[in-house]
Swiss-Prot record:
Keywords: Ribonucleoprotein, Ribosomal protein. NCBIfam families: S21p. One of its GO terms (cellular component) is ribosome. Disulfide bonds: none annotated. One of its GO terms (molecular function) is structural constituent of ribosome. GO terms for biological process: translation. PROSITE patterns: RIBOSOMAL_S21. InterPro entries: Ribosomal_bS21, Ribosomal_bS21_CS, Ribosomal_bS21_sf. It holds the Pfam family Ribosomal_S21. This is Small ribosomal subunit protein bS21. The keyword Manganese does not apply.
């Protein structure tokens, strides 16, 4: 859980920026967006397969094999 203790004399904008940075680092926003709507297991499986295929193609292009 993201917790930001505001230092004495610290501006609100600076504290908010630190909070956003912590949330990004912990993946809270990404997780929230992923859980916003129910995803059927078949759709989840297809999404993961697509991502794996995309990573494979990217790796092959980087090696110059594709």
């Amino acid at each position: 859980m993201a917790v930001v203790v505001v230092q004495e004399g610290e501006s609100f904008e600076k504290a908010l920026k630190r909070f956003k940075k912590i949330c990004e680092k912990e993946g809270i926003i990404t997780e929230m967006k992923r859980r916003e709507f129910y995803e059927k297991p078949s759709v989840k499986r297809k999404r993961k397969q697509r991502a794996a295929r995309k990573r494979l193609i990217k790796a092959l292009k980087k090696k110059g094999l594709l």
